[in-house]
A protein has these predicted regions:
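Short gly/pro-enriched beta-turn/loop segments at secondary-structure junctions
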Residues: 36, 94-96, 120
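Nudix hydrolase/Nudix homology domain
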Residues: 24-27, 64, 76, 105-179
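Short, well-ordered strand-loop elements centered on a beta-strand within folded domains, enriched
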Residues: 19-22, 48-54, 134-139
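Acidic, metal-coordinating catalytic segment for phosphate/diphosphate chemistry
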Residues: 2-40, 44-46
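Hydrophobic alpha-helical segments and helix-packing faces
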Residues: 34, 59, 63, 67, ...
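A glycine-rich, hydrophobic loop/mini-helix early in the fold
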Residues: 38-71
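The catalytic Nudix box helix
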Residues: 52, 69-103, 125
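Residues immediately flanking
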Residues: 15, 55, 152
């Protein structure tokens, strides 16, 4: 993970959301994290269940926390939708049948208990796999500690009644999404 993060570039953004440079991913997250481009994906099966993941314990931000299906950063010049599909494959071993942008301008800033800041312009996607995913998810252990399929209504309920149990971005995203 450290090697991949050191090589991966994150797109920095100005206050208007325009690209303003790049920074190695390994250096971007700290106590004064600059605004940068990311994305979030909520992956559903044909029964309407959401794939939730528990972040790996070695993650720099919010280790061990339950969250949406997949998150990541588009590379310089990479379309966020293409990056979302790429990361679903890398993190979960899955390829979506459909992908839809549902919150194009979502932006948030969150401070973890250890002072590490996330500050992202984070387009949010819904993705679907038709039928039961074959093969089932095969998560990258450097990214995902655990996973399960849950009803969307249950995830929304947890985000509302026990927000401390989820990543701060997923709580804010769920609040911004239609019921």
């Amino acid at each position: 993970m450290a090697t991949r993060a050191a090589e991966e570039l994150v797109v920095l953004l100005d206050e208007g959301g325009r690209p303003a440079g790049t920074m190695p991913k390994a250096e971007v997250h700290g106590t004064d994290t600059p605004l940068h481009l990311a994305f979030s994906v909520y992956l559903f099966d044909s029964g309407g269940r959401l794939l939730v993941t528990r972040r790996a314990l070695q993650k720099r931000t919010w280790p061990g926390v339950w969250t949406n299906s997949c998150c990541g950063h588009p590379g310089p010049g990479e379309d966020p939708a293409a990056a979302a599909e790429r990361r679903l494959g890398q993190e979960l071993g899955l390829r979506p049948d459909r992908l839809e942008l549902v919150l194009p301008e979502f932006t948030y800033r969150a401070v973890a208990a250890d002072g590490i800041v996330e500050h992202e312009r984070c387009p949010v996607f819904f993705a679907w796999v038709d039928g039961d995913p074959e093969p089932p998810p095969t998560p990258d252990p450097e990214e995902v500690a655990d996973w399960r399929w849950v009803p969307w209504a249950s995830f929304r309920a947890v985000a509302t009644t026990a927000p401390w149990a989820l990543s701060p971005w997923s709580v804010e995203q769920v609040a911004a999404l239609p019921a």
